[in-house]
Amino acid sequence: MPAQSQHPVDTLIFARWIIPVAPNCTPLAEHALAIRNGEICALLPAKEAETIEAAEVLRLDNHVLMPGLINAHGHAAMSLFRGMADDKPLHTWLNDHIWPAEGRWVDEAFVRDGCELAIAEMLRSGTTTFSDMYFFPEAAAGIIRKAGIRAQLSFPIFDFPCAWGSGPVKLFLLA
């Protein structure tokens, strides 16, 4: 993406490597990204970028700059169950460990705390968007808004009782 102009920019980010999505995710060494009015306006070799005036300059000499990662399937609050019987086969893990633990521990506060942990970990590791399917989605939504991360929430509807409701009709009405 060539520079649109040599006009001043808001932010200029120099990075050891930049991995743009287009044309084909080819890593670019010693490049810079220019941002004006909240939008990328140029991606160019670092030597060319040195001539551009910027209000803010970031030098990430040992970093890779790339688009945010997207977690397309998750149960963020379950971060609090991490490591629980994770060596068991799926149905044993669910039936004998996870579902009983959810019945005992999951409530609105659990979902808030688990989402805070999961979102902090996602943001720290470069995830900027995630999909979440879990109980008390309104509690998750509050944490998502507070953190400023993008998310797609879906509502669990199944034919057995849980902490959020009981049976498909009641769960559907909550959604």
Question: What is each of the regions a protein language model found here?
Answer:
Residues P23-N24, L33, I70-N71, N95, ...:
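Short capping/connector residues at structural and topological boundaries
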Residues A76, P137, F158-D159:
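Glycine-rich beta-alpha junction loops
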Residues G68-G74, F130-D132, A151-S154:
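Hydrophobic faces of well-ordered beta-strands that scaffold small-molecule active sites
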Residues A141-A175:
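Metal-coordinating catalytic core of metallo-dependent amide/deamination hydrolases
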Residues R82-I149, A175:
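Alpha-helical scaffold segments that flank or form the walls of functional sites
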Residues R16, L33, G38, N62, ...:
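Divalent metal-coordination and catalytic microenvironments
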Residues M1-I52:
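N-terminal metal-binding scaffold of metallo-dependent hydrolase/deaminase domains
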